From Swiss-Prot:
This is Tat-binding homolog 7. It comes from Caenorhabditis elegans. ATP binds at G432, P433, P434, G435, T436, G437, K438, T439. Residues 914-1022 form the Bromo domain. Residues 88-99 have a biased composition (Polar residues). Belongs to the AAA ATPase family. InterPro entries: AAA+_ATPase (IPR003593), AAA_lid_3 (IPR041569), ATAD2-like (IPR045199), ATPase_AAA_core (IPR003959), ATPase_AAA_CS (IPR003960), Bromodomain (IPR001487), Bromodomain-like_sf (IPR036427), Bromodomain_CS (IPR018359). Residues 298-311, 1128-1142 have a biased composition (Basic residues). Pfam families: AAA, AAA_lid_3, Bromodomain. Residues 64-82, 1168-1190 have a biased composition (Basic and acidic residues).
């Protein structure tokens, strides 16, 4: 039995060895009571050598708590009788034992106390007695409340005063003072001390104390004996039995036959204990019993959580401790709080639970043999979109065919591999820039493996899933993953971002990663065969992958995912727009978008389509951005045009520009005028055909069969080419680095590009290593097709890059043969004649392409395109173009706004049914209480027509309590308001039919009012308001999810979007709350209509143009002579009587820049009707607004004054000629700088109707323009700059 104090229960019931020795020395045999066991419990006397036994019969030899010496005590037949009596009492209950102990204590109190006699000892006897007393008092005595009271009572009975001190007490005090100086001796019990002349035995006070405490010890000893018996029963249940106890039991017969001669008992020396009073003992015992009961109930929990302290049967003060059993979870603490065992297994992501159960017997047998799935990773299988297949992947036909060879062919045609004794490829690595479709192909492969009879298990793991902070745990996860894949073979393991799991091993790397890489290498191609397990890895950086993985046997194939070319981009756009149906753009639009999206990856194109749809939605229905409620939209009217795609392209940064390593950028509409012909001629004349387009068999084949057959044909021969783009003697910067080079790369976007620029080589501070990696990658790519090696601004490159790298470049170029398909493209920011010697060693004069300044005709077209925007009129916002959609909350065609799975729907239906059932039970109980009340007996049954003939003629809806109970039985009440309304209807009918003039009428009316008070008391006090609100909430959730219960009806009167603001009560019913919510919603809708510019039904607005727009202080007068302000571009709005115009609506009708600065300056004229004969002369320029809605909404007529754009065409022509003459011999960069300033100035006047002064301002900017080559206020033509004080370039 567990103990709270840490000591043995029997230890707490005994006293020190000193007390017992005195008792043996001073008491008679019959005074021993049952303190020690009789001879039947002893094996032998064992007096000489110190071998003895405890009261329970346990051998105490060689125990460190027992002394070698012993004290003799004489046992008699009376002791045997008392012991047998005590043993027989054990069969009694606890209460009987306590009562027997109390009776024995009362009998012992009647025994007269021992008399004290004064004796005189000789000198030798006094010394022996003092020495014995000293030894007895070496153990400190601790008095408790119980012993103190008993000792004080004994002193009073004996008549001993507190001031008197006996020789024994003085000897005891002296022994205490010398106790620390003298060594502690073993306790020995001597024979009783006789008097000199043969007197009586001397009994010291301490011995009398021990005798006085004996009766309490009997009571407490019985309690301890009962606890021992409970502990013995516990040991018997556990099936354990001490062999020593069995030996003791077998020796009982022998000991009983022994003689009844005086026995000797071996006593032990014990440590002092903390004594306690009786109340504390009872409380501690109850606590121990309660703890023991709880421990028995939770025995299985205690055994699982650790070792358990067992009860000790020995008499020693130390408890027997059991060493804890080794727990596997303690060796793996991270596995302690795992979920279910099935959740810890590696399961494929492309198989459902039903498919796994169908082949469960096979999988379980395999996992039993491989010992897989025991405590594996705690990672849920990733959900894969099952709609993604190979048909959803565009531009990667070669990769798909390669995966079929690796995965499907060994499973479908194993006889081919068996015939030739070859192993199929079992490893593929995907590498390329982010967003090029590596993970998409993996998802498509996982779904393709689900189709057909032969299913393939697909395991998908990211690199970090297998990492762990525990030593060896990562390797264990990898091993279990491969074991599980082998058990469920054929299978595929896909490692996404495998470079984080198996990086390049080096001396600077952590040993843990090296161990993981070694384990992965051994699992992929070690001594154990992998079987039908294919490993696929994906990474963005192939150079960071460990080289040992990149060999046949592990990763057999390396598939490069490059940026899609023109054809691939067109296929990707077709895939993403295939389900748009009638909203799909025309094919010409998609072709233009595919050509403009050079450098976009697959993810960029998908996001481009998403952004285009959102922009089209915003341009068609801008109302949804200003309204929080759902509106009814006609999706078929949303047309996606090239303009929407153009806006979306401005929001996206393509993949080629994110890293800034490859300067790929197509020419825009403006720069194509200057350099479009140059780029086209350069690509068509100087670059071979093999670089311009893909000429492999798959690109030129007319059918899929031809593609498969001709896929093995070698690629056409492409020679090695070196091209250097440089400037001319007249113009060093012809745009070769900033414009021409990016445009060429955009045209050749189907080729892999490897940059040797300064930024790419000096990124990590080791240019030699970076240069070597780039050259190796280019050589590896050239083995499968042509590629480009890029070196921009070579004259600046040789100034920054070390000489060692320069020599490495020359060596690399010289090692290339003429058949190496590498296009080495470089630019020079000066002319070839001024090039450094290093450049002339690499490039010949035949490899140079000189860019000359733009011709006059080209520059004229260029500036005409820039200045063309000056003739664009300002945009006038017309709200009638945007049709206002109607709210769509209550439409039956609207889809559910809340999506619930099957489990959530089942739980929600179960909850709603339970709530309805609880509500009906509550109402039935309360209604039954009202029906039993004799005061309301008149309302229980229907009114008898014989007693009230005209009742059913006067009362339209008669009702009684029986009718209400019948409705409850038929489940017609789904809300508390309906039940309360029917109860109140009883009162209403009673008050309506029974007049207050008659005696019976007064009595019935009084009962009806009392019924109403009883109803209010029941509902308000006993019905929980949160319970009613919970019913409303669950019903609304089911309505949002589109779920209809079969048994209980939903609260269909609750509209969508309804939410309570106040708690439910009898005064605040559901109908009242819905009515208040509806009124607030209508007010919000009206406010939204005013924001959108749609007026009220009775509102009619007329716009009157201001007569003098240029006058600074003039005022305009209306037909009634009311003055109105004449500020810049203000419009006077007039309304009918009783209507007020909102500032919000006015600001929406006006253009953004024509908004008045102070709304208070406008004078609103009321009570004014403008007729046709009262129109002003400028009314022919007014435009009437269309109807705000095609439905039966009221028409709103708004006239907007249309003005003519004032621009001087001769001044515009002179501006263009000035720009052409000024830009003679300018570079492309300088022309772009000037055009940007001109465009910015034109944009400042985009909202102005009068632009007469704009050409003059632009001409002044052009004439004052200072180029980068100008200095000391001079320009190219040699004329002086007259505006010395102005800032150059319009800044």
């Amino acid at each position: 039995m567990p103990r709270s104090d840490g000591f043995s229960p029997r230890k707490n019931l005994r006293r020190s060895a000193r007390d017992h020795s005195r008792s043996y020395a001073g008491q008679c045999n019959e005074d021993f009571d049952d303190m020690y066991a009789p001879s039947s419990r002893r094996r032998s006397s064992g007096g000489v050598d110190g071998n003895g036994y405890t009261r329970s019969g346990r051998k105490i030899n060689h125990n460190r708590y027992y002394e070698e010496e012993y004290h003799e005590a004489i046992s008699s037949e009376e002791d045997e009788r008392r012991y047998r009596t005590r043993r027989s009492s054990n069969s009694m209950t606890y209460r009987q034992q306590v009562m027997q102990a109390i009776d024995e204590s009362k009998r012992n109190q009647k025994v007269p106390p021992a008399k004290r006699k004064r004796i005189y000892l000789s000198d030798e006897e006094e010394e022996d007695f003092a020495e014995a007393a000293h030894v007895e008092n070496t153990v400190p005595e601790r008095a408790t409340r119980r012993s103190t009271r008993r000792r004080s009572s004994m002193h009073e009975e004996l008549g001993v005063s507190e001031q008197e001190e006996s020789p024994v007490r003085r000897t005891r005090k002296a022994a205490k003072r010398l106790g620390s100086e003298q060594p502690e001796e073993n306790l020995a019990a001597d024979d009783p001390l006789p008097m000199e002349g043969g007197g009586e035995i001397v009994l010291p006070i301490a011995e009398i104390d021990g005798m006085a405490e004996q009766e309490n010890e009997d009571l407490i000893e019985k309690i301890g004996r009962e606890e021992e018996e409970e502990g013995a029963e516990e040991d018997e249940q556990s099936g354990e039995k001490d062999p020593e106890e069995e030996e003791d039991d077998s020796s009982n017969a022998e000991s009983s036959e022994e003689s009844t001669a005086p026995r000797q008992y071996s006593l032990r020396r014990r440590q002092p204990v903390v004594q306690f009073n009786a109340s504390e003992a009872r409380e501690n015992r109850r606590a121990r019993l309660e703890h023991h009961r709880v421990a028995n109930q939770n025995r299985h929990h205690r055994n699982r959580n650790g070792s358990r302290r067992r009860r000790s049967d020995s008499d020693s003060d130390s408890d027997d401790m059991v060493l804890p059993r080794p727990d596997k979870r303690q060796s793996r603490p991270h596995m302690h709080n795992r979920g279910e065992r099935e959740r810890g297994r590696f399961m494929p992501i492309n198989m459902t639970e039903k498919e796994l159960q169908s082949a469960q017997h096979i999988l379980m047998d395999r996992m039993r043999k491989t010992d897989a799935g025991q405590g594996a990773s705690d990672i849920d299988p990733m959900s894969v979109d099952s709609s993604v297949g190979f048909d959803q992947v565009g531009g990667l036909g070669h990769h798909i065919q390669s995966l079929k060879e690796v995965v499907l062919f060994p499973m479908l045609y194993p006889e081919v591999f068996e015939k030739f004794r070859i192993n199929p490829p079992k490893g593929v690595v995907f590498y390329g820039p982010p967003g090029t479709g590596k993970t998409l192909v993996a998802r498509a492969l996982a779904n393709e493996c689900r189709r057909g009879a032969n299913k393939v298990a697909f395991f998908m793991r990211k690199g970090a899933d297998c990492l762990s902070k525990w030593v060896g745990e990562s390797e264990r996860q990898l091993r279990l993953l491969f074991d599980q894949a082998y058990a469920m073979r054929p299978s595929i393991i896909f490692f996404d971002e495998i470079d984080g799991l198996a990086p390049v091993r080096s001396s600077k790397q952590d040993q843990i990663h090296a161990s993981i890489v070694s384990t992965l290498l051994a699992l992929m191609d070690g001594l154990d065969g992998r079987g039908e397990v294919v490993v696929i890895g994906a990474t963005n950086r192939l150079d960071t992958l460990d080289p040992a993985l990149r060999r046949p046997g592990r990763f057999d194939r390396e598939l490069r995912f490059s940026l899609p070319d023109l054809n691939a981009r067109r296929q990707i756009l077709d895939i993403h727009t295939s389900k748009w149906e009638e909203n799909k753009p025309i094919p010409e639009t998609l072709d233009a978008i595919a050509e403009r999206t050079s450098g976009y990856c697959g993810a960029d194109l998908k996001f481009l389509c998403t952004e285009a749809v959102l922009i089209g939605l915003r341009s068609r229905y801008p109302h949804i951005y200003m309204c929080s409620e759902r509106l009814k939209l006609d999706v078929a009217t949303i047309k996606i045009t090239s303009e929407h795609f153009g806006h979306a392209m401005r929001r996206i940064t393509p993949a080629s520009r994110r890293d800034l390593t490859i300067p790929s950028r197509p020419l825009d509409e403006r720069t194509s005028i200057l350099l479009g012909d140059t780029v086209s001629n350069l690509i068509s004349l100087r670059i071979p055909q093999g670089y311009r387009c893909v000429e492999n068999a798959m690109a030129t084949a007319s059918s899929e069969l031809e593609q498969v057959v001709r896929a093995l044909e070698p690629n056409p021969t492409v020679p090695a080419i070196r091209l250097l783009l440089c400037g001319s003697e007249q113009l060093a910067d012809g745009g070769q680095t900033s414009y021409v080079l990016p445009a060429i790369l955009a045209k050749l976007d189907h080729l892999p590009v490897f940059s040797l620029s300064v930024s790419s080589l000096l990124t990590d501070g080791r240019p030699e290593e970076a240069f070597s990696n780039a050259i190796q990658s280019a050589m590896r790519a050239s083995a499968t097709g042509p590629c480009i090696m890029l070196l921009p601004s070579i004259d600046e490159w040789i100034k920054v890059i070390p000489v060692s790298v320069q020599h490495m470049l020359i060596t690399c170029l010289e090692s290339m043969t003429g058949f190496t398909p590498i296009l080495f493209l470089s630019t020079l920011d000066t002319s070839f004649e001024d090039a450094p010697e290093y450049v002339t060693e690499i490039f010949r004069h035949a490899n140079c392409i000189t860019l000359n300044p733009s011709r006059r005709t080209i520059r004229q077209k260029y500036f005409e395109h820039v200045i063309e925007k000056i003739n664009t009129p300002p945009k006038v916002f017309d709200p009638t173009v945007y049709e206002m959609p109607l709210p769509d909350d209550d439409s039956p065609d609207s889809k559910p706004s809340r999506k619930l799975n099957d489990d959530e729907t089942r739980e929600l239906l179960k909850m709603y049914t339970a709530l309805q059932r609880q509500m009906r039970l509550f109402f039935k109980e309360r209604l039954t209480r009202l029906m039993r009340d004799r005061r309301f007996v008149e309302f229980v049954e229907p009114v008898d027509p014989d007693e009230a003939e005209d009742y059913y003629e006067i009362i339209e809806t008669p009702i009684c309590m029986q009718d209400i109970m019948e409705k409850l039985n038929n489940c017609e009440y789904n809300h508390a308001d309906k039940f309360v309304a029917d109860l109140i209807l009883i009162q209403t009918n009673a008050l309506e039919y029974n007049p207050s003039t008659t005696k019976d009428g007064k009595l019935i009316r009084q009962m009806a009012n009392t019924l109403r008070d009883a109803i209010d008391d029941l509902i308000e006090c006993e019905l929980d308001e949160s319970f009613v609100e919970r019913i409303e909430t669950v019903s609304r959730m089911l309505q949002d999810a589109g779920v209809t219960p079969t048994s209980d009806k939903l609260l269909t009167e609750i509209p969508k979007g309804f939410a309570r603001k106040k708690a439910w009560s009898m005064t605040n019913s559901l109908a009242k709350e819905i009515e208040q919510w509806t009124s607030e919603r209508e007010a919000e809708n009206q406010k939204m209509l005013s924001k959108l510019g749609v007026a009220a039904p009775t509102l009619e607005l007329v716009v009157v143009p201001v007569e003098d727009m240029k006058s600074e202080e003039g005022t305009s007068t209306s037909t009634d002579g009311v003055p109105a302000s004449a500020g810049n571009k203000k419009k006077l709005l007039k309304k009918k009587k009783g209507q007020k115009k909102s500032k919000t609506g006015e600001s929406e009708e006006h253009d953004e820049d024509s908004t008045v600065e102070d709304a208070g300056e406008d004078t609103i004229v009321e009570n004014l009707e403008i007729k046709k004969n009262q129109e002003t002369p400028n009314s022919e320029h007014d435009i009437e607004m269309k109807d705000a809605s095609k439905d039966s909404t009221p028409s709103v007529q708004i006239s907007i004054a249309e003005k003519e754009l004032i621009v001087s065409k001769p001044a515009t022509c002179e501006l263009i000629q000035c720009c052409v003459e000024k830009s003679e011999g300018w570079s492309v960069s300088e022309l772009e700088r000037l055009s940007s300033v001109l465009s910015h100035t034109i944009e400042r006047f985009r909202d102005e109707w009068n632009r007469e002064n704009l050409p003059a301002q632009l001409t002044q900017i052009v004439r004052e323009w200072q180029t980068a080559d100008d200095s000391n206020n001079t320009i190219v033509n040699g004329t002086l700059n007259k505006s010395n004080g102005n800032l150059a370039n319009g800044h």
